[in-house]
Amino acid sequence: MKLVYCAQFHETCGYSHAAMGYLRAIDSVLSDHPQVNFKILSLSFDVRTLSSVPPEDLDLIEKYHFSSQGELDNFLKEGEYNCIWHMTSVVPDLFEIKNIGHLYNNLSWNLRSVIKGSLENYHLLAWETDELPQEYKEAISRYNTKEVIAPSKWNKDTISKIFKSKFIPHVIEGQHTEKNKQLDLPINIKDKFVVFCLSEWVRRKNFNSLVKAFICEFHDKEDAVLVIKTSIPKRVSQESFISSFKQLRDSVRVPSQRENNIILLIDYLDKENINYLYEACDLFALPSYGEGFSIPTAQAASAGKNILCSPVGGHVDYL
């Protein structure tokens, strides 16, 4: 049996974190299934993020990725194979646009052709609302996808209205089993009430409400601190992003002198530093408008932390 798993392995977005979780799980059991010829194909919308992929993840990507054009071509041409494509449904079409994406090892391959050329293809999809966009429906139908794999019951219920769907949760590594490394922060967070948020900075994550609510409640409390770990959106300069954040922070009017109790972290942090922030926090807060699963929230729940989040979405499965 030949199986190729296509995903954004060498990025730092939510889809890449989920894909690496599945890849580690597959790696842990693959030796028990020698009949499976398993390979991966990795794509990215931002080649700059490759430098932020942890070395141990790169080693695992290298272990299963096609190392040469010849190896890839032979795999696709010699005998039938099945395909898993783990991404938003429109990514194969987006990658048809010249210079919009990067293929790992600079190999030459067409994502739509890889999917269509498979004996059976399975689409692994997380979505944030209770209805799929029309372009997603059209893409899934166009590839004659056998089954859509959903990481949450919320997603499965949504997808099952239109397509055959199977529920397979994302893989979460328990924070209590991971090493952590203390992080030098501009504020000493020891003995403080720490609110922690980890996510990409997009409108859907509703950071504006989080920042405003924290300031309204804790602006004059020196024993409370909000720690936000995020990344600068694409095509936005660091200077512009920080300026916008300060405007957001300063736009909240409060009746008394405010404390300097918000920490914004935008630089790359290794896994041990992230684990430290999870361990140090008292509350994980992500008031998102919609989540298909939310790996950061799941990791906080795994660590036994208090959670503040929206009452609907994929994350409700495990809260």
Predicted features along the sequence, with ranges:
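Short alpha-helical donor nucleotide-sugar binding micro-motif in glycosyltransferases
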Residues: 275-281
